[in-house]
């Protein structure tokens, strides 16, 4: 039997997709990593089991939640400790947290639990081993935590509106994987199908942390939360600059994420017709989107205004979804979306993907980078110049003599080994700059190219400082979605847009920017609970709290 080729439209151009203005409004989709992970859990009808619970009445102690996936057992070892309110901080400089976690490979022994109970609260300063897959920590959201505990102790359920407003009772401030601080290197588990996907181990840890938080609040509250309320409680996350450089330092991985997403959209746009059941599903989801937007509020006035504008724009747009043409319905919707904001366009992308899992879910297997960037030497500097002209015209258009075009510099702090941003004209340390100034480097390399063709090796012998730029040009020539096509050292660069892009691939919702440098988000809100993992439960995109 011949392999089936799924029809598709042309992919959107990288110069349109890879702009921060668009990346900064991306939405979670069914290709997001947490969603992919929960689909696998549902497909295997996995059951989360609490196999250890040693907690005092106030909720301090240790716990273990286990799940079998792909024929292997994984266990979240949780350590809950008292924390003074004055010490509760989302900042990376914090040294204590309400809870610390390790995702453990296998069934932990009593000695393993005791070791993690000692080491996990120390986080970066702890000692870990090859069976420790993920290291994390979290703080309670005391507003909602206290309200739920008080309600349960009084014998009633907490207010649904408050759960909808806040959305989580614990907020992680770091989820470390891939060998960080001595935990297991990725290659130890990368060949396991259940953990082969992008950030699969980290997403499994987040999902189990959510279950732990629900068990803990019910233990302390001495009552049982309504299932619908429990389902709407996710895991919060506070994320800052530490996440932003990842998209630059992993260009092939970024390309693969984007290509999968763009290919999914291209496939959906090529669907010639759809049945009545799918039309009804689209109408249902359009209503859900409206409800989700109406329940998404943030304190920042500019961001809140943008959300309300998107809510109004969706209300004006959705009639296109209620009255789809018989032929090429998705292409019609996509064409109509082009007259609207990029925020609405990306919301439409997510909705179109949501109703077409049968033709796009397999693309999740393409969202990893097992090989890295292969060398691709140019025939000579003429070919190098051509590649710059084809892919990097936007960088050549930037006037780097303008101080505001190169004011920022990225560096890594000595105390926490975390990315930071500096002002090269007002602060010391620019000599320690991390090479995220890709556009400037490419422009400088272009300016030094010889007029006549010569081997690239000869060019780099004379100008060794351009080696990194040449490597990036070569990567982009083969992987067109590998580069953010904006100036990352300009005063106009908003790192929050980079965070939004990456977090949308994780599956984040309810983005709540606190500045241009950090944000809070929610993960797993609406996801099935640990004893509800069945195929019928894979329907929690943009959840709405029924108040």
PLM features: residue spans?
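Short glycine-rich, low-complexity/disordered patches
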Residues: 31-39, 43-60, 127-169, 179-188, ...
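Long amphipathic alpha-helical coiled-coil/heptad-repeat bundle
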Residues: 254-282, 290-332, 338
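Long, solvent-exposed non-transmembrane regions
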Residues: 5-25, 58-60, 78, 273, ...
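Intrinsically disordered, low-complexity segments enriched in Gly and acidic/Ser/Thr residues
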Residues: 307, 325-327, 335-514
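Charged, amphipathic alpha-helical stretches
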Residues: 2-68
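Ampiphathic alpha-helical segments that act as solvent-exposed interaction surfaces
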Residues: 30-40, 94-167, 271, 524-541, ...
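Intrinsically disordered, low-complexity regulatory segments enriched in Ser/Thr/Pro
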Residues: 71-130, 183-187, 197-250, 254-263, ...
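An N-terminal assembly and electron-transfer interface module characteristic of large anaerobic redox
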Residues: 202, 236, 257, 313-320, ...
């Amino acid at each position: 039997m011949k392999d089936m080729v799924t029809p598709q439209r042309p992919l959107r151009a990288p110069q349109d997709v890879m702009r921060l203005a668009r990346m900064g409004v991306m939405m979670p989709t069914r290709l997001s990593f947490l969603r992919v992970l929960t689909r696998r859990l549902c497909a295997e009808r996995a059951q989360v089991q609490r196999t250890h619970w040693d907690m005092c009445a106030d909720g301090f102690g240790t716990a273990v939640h286990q799940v079998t996936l792909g024929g292997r057992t994984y266990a979240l070892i949780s350590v809950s400790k008292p924390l003074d309110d004055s010490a509760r901080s989302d900042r990376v400089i914090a040294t204590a947290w309400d809870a610390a976690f390790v995702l453990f490979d296998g069934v932990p022994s009593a000695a393993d639990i005791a070791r993690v109970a000692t080491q996990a609260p120390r986080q970066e300063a702890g000692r870990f081993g090859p069976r420790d897959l993920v290291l994390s920590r979290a703080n309670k959201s005391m507003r909602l935590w206290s309200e739920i505990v008080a309600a349960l102790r009084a014998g009633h359920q907490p207010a649904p509106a408050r759960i909808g407003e806040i959305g989580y009772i614990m907020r992680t401030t770091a989820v470390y994987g891939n060998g960080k601080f001595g935990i297991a290197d990725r290659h130890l588990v990368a060949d396991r199908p259940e953990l082969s996907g992008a950030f699969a181990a980290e997403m499994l840890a987040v999902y189990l942390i959510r279950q732990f938080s629900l068990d803990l609040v019910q233990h302390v509250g001495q009552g049982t939360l309504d299932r619908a309320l429990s389902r709407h409680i996710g895991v919060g996350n506070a994320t800052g600059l530490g996440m932003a450089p990842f998209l630059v330092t992993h260009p092939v991985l970024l390309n693969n994420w984007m290509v999968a997403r763009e290919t999914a959209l291209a496939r959906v746009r090529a669907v010639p017709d759809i049945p009545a059941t799918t039309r009804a599903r689209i109408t249902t989801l359009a209503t859900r989107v409206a409800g989700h937007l109406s329940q998404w509020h943030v304190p920042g006035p500019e961001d809140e205004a943008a959300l309300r504008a998107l809510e109004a724009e969706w209300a004006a747009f959705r009639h296109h979804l209620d009255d789809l043409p018989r032929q090429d319905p998705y292409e019609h919707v996509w064409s109509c979306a082009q007259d609207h904001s990029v925020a609405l366009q990306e919301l439409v992308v997510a909705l179109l993907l949501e109703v077409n899992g049968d033709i796009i879910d397999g693309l999740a297997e393409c969202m990893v980078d097992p090989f890295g960037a292969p060398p691709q030497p140019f025939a000579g500097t003429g070919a190098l110049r051509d590649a710059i002209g084809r892919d990097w015209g936007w960088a050549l258009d930037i006037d780097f003599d303008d101080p505001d075009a190169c004011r920022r510099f990225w560096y890594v702090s000595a105390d926490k080994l975390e990315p930071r941003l500096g002002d090269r004209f007002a602060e010391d340390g620019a000599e320690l700059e991390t090479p995220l100034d890709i556009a400037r480097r490419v422009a400088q390399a272009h300016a030094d190219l010889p007029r006549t063709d010569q081997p690239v090796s000869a060019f780099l012998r004379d100008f060794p400082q351009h080696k990194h730029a040449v490597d990036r040009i070569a990567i982009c020539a083969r992987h067109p979605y590998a580069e953010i096509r904006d100036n990352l050292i300009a005063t106009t660069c908003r790192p929050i847009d980079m965070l939004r892009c990456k977090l949308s691939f994780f599956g984040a919702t309810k983005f709540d920017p606190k500045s241009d440098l950090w944000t809070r988000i929610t993960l797993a809100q609406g996801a099935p609970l640990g004893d509800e993992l069945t195929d019928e439960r894979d329907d929690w995109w943009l959840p709405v709290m029924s108040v």
